């Protein structure tokens, strides 16, 4: 393992970030954050409780009036300054992200952190072009449409892309003029707390408040808090049900980006070199811990026997290991719970004669990796899309492969899922690509690539994969409410009474 001086990047302990100050939790309790690549403890973070949530929400509420009333240009300048400072600290923040999450530094330094910075920059531009409208309904009647912030936003983000997912919430929420209480996962909170140091230097007091704690404790308290006017959550569908219920109970608008079991469809005219890279992007990027992962690989029967051996070889040549080794292509799963979940699905495959593990399927413990949570890139062949392995989200570097004969069968298999977050199509026939894309019941379709999520392209799911869209200009509407000002310009009575 690369020898990283952790204290150059991570403090020994962190408090809650409330009203621009780092402070201990009301209970004084803490949580320990560990490095999943070697099992070593990284830092202690404050464990927020209900009183801390109350305090953070009050700080956000107190800051809302002044923050929401500043000019668009000034608010955009704040966002641009945050973006600039994130870019300046790319090496620092990317190192923190890799240490706490286990993902390769080559990903955090070129994707996670730069794209997080870009979200603030992008929504600064969205803000300055976000305009209401005037409609002259008739000669004596005028309708003004005004976009206004919702108020205090309560957000909780998952552990797989901590700083990036936080930026997906914070960029549009702040641009719209809201204040925010946000909580990262208890297993990966450090990059967002480090980001809070930038907020402390740049933003007015109380505009962003960062809590650390358990999702079932402080996270739940955020979602049920009477002072929170908008909910935003990225995580599992199981937890998403509870967030949706919390929003429904108080009639609070809710944005959800949840699970997926996305189909990556390979047609027989596809460029196989591009396919092999695309399949790996789909399921090995971020160790397969991606809600949009191409975890179901649908291969046209006529090229199945040609493609599978090449894919097997490619998976077996992936270097898994030290996240700071520049040759590492895949690193540690985020923790023991996730590794256990992956292994439970491997056991299902091993005990079922309808499933064939073509390659992988084992934890990696050699070459100094025994203290971390590393897993082999895995391919499992199945012949029934109703199989548990094809229907449930594994959330790891495990792809299940199925055959299809024609375009219509591919569409039917792809749509046979309770999820609808993403999907991929590999073909050189643009007509086929567009026809299949239109027929797939999913929010994002990649054609001849996979897992590209830049600012400016809407991302979000159909069905049980969520509600709302992110990383796109319309995402600002998630954090706005529309006011109509209806004006009678006639200066005359209507004669009705």
Curated annotation (Swiss-Prot):
Matching SUPFAM superfamilies: ALDH-like
Catalysed reactions, as listed in the record: an aldehyde + NAD(+) + H2O = a carboxylate + NADH + 2 H(+)
Cleaved signal peptide residues: none
Catalytic residue positions: 257, 291
EC number: 1.2.1.3
Coiled coil: none
GO molecular function terms listed in the Swiss-Prot or TrEMBL record: aldehyde dehydrogenase (NAD+) activity
Residues binding NAD(+): 213-219
UniProt-listed InterPro entries: Ald_DH/histidinol_DH (IPR016161), Ald_DH_C (IPR016163), Ald_DH_CS_CYS (IPR016160), Ald_DH_CS_GLU (IPR029510), Ald_DH_N (IPR016162), Aldehyde_DH_dom (IPR015590)
Enzyme class: oxidoreductase
Disulfide bond residue pairs: none
Entry keywords, A to Z: NAD, Oxidoreductase
Family per similarity comment: Belongs to the aldehyde dehydrogenase family.
The protein's name in its UniProt record: Putative aldehyde dehydrogenase AldA
């Amino acid at each position: 393992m690369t020898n990283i001086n952790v204290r150059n990047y991570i403090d020994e302990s962190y408090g809650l970030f409330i009203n621009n100050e780092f402070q201990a939790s009301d209970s004084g309790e803490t949580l320990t954050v560990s490095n999943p690549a070697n099992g070593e403890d990284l830092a202690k973070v404050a464990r927020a409780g209900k009183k801390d949530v109350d305090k953070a929400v009050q700080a956000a509420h107190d800051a809302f009036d002044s923050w929401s009333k500043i000019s668009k240009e000034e608010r955009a300048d704040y966002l641009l300054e945050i973006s600039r400072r994130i870019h300046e600290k790319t090496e620092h923040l990317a190192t923190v992200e890799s240490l706490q999450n286990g993902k390769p530094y080559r990903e955090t330094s070129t994707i996670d952190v730069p794209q997080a910075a870009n979200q603030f920059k992008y929504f600064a531009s969205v803000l300055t072009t976000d305009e209401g409208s005037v409609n002259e309904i008739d000669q004596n009647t005028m309708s003004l449409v005004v976009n206004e912030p919702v108020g205090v936003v309560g957000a909780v983000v998952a552990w797989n892309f901590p700083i990036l997912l936080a930026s997906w919430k914070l960029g549009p929420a702040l641009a719209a003029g809201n204040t925010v209480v946000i909580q990262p996962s208890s297993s990966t909170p450090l990059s967002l707390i480090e980001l809070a140091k930038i907020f402390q230097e740049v933003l007015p007091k109380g505009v962003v408040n960062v809590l650390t704690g358990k999702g079932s404790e402080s996270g739940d308290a955020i979602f049920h808090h009477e002072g929170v006017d908008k909910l935003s959550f990225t995580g599992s569908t199981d937890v998403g049900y509870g967030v949706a219920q919390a929003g429904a109970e108080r009639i609070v608008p809710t944005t959800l980006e949840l699970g997926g079991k996305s189909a990556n469809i390979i047609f027989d005219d596809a460029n196989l070199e591009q396919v092999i890279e695309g399949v790996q992007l789909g399921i090995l990027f971020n160790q397969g811990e991606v809600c949009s992962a191409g975890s179901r690989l649908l291969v046209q029967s006529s090229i199945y026997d040609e493609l599978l051996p090449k894919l097997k070889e490619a998976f077996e040549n992936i270097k898994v290991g030290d996240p700071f080794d520049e040759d590492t292509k895949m690193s540690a799963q985020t923790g023991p719970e996730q590794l256990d979940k992956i292994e439970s699905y491997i056991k299902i495959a091993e005990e079922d004669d309808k499933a064939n593990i073509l390659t992988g399927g084992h934890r990696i413990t050699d070459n100094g990796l025994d203290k971390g949570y590393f897993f082999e890139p895995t391919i499992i062949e199945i012949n029934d899309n109703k199989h548990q392995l094809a229907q449930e989200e594994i959330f790891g570097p495990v792809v299940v492969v199925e055959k299809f004969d024609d375009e219509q069968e591919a569409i039917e298999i792809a749509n046979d899922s309770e999820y609808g977050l993403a999907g991929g199509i590999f073909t050189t026939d643009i007509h086929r690509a567009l026809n299949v894309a239109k027929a797939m019941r999913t929010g994002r379709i990649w054609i001849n690539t996979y897992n590209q999520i830049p600012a400016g392209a809407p991302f979000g799911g159909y069905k049980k994969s969520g509600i709302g869209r992110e990383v796109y200009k319309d995402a600002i509407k998630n954090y706005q409410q529309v006011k109509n000002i209806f004006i009678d310009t006639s200066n005359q009575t209507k004669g009705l009474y």
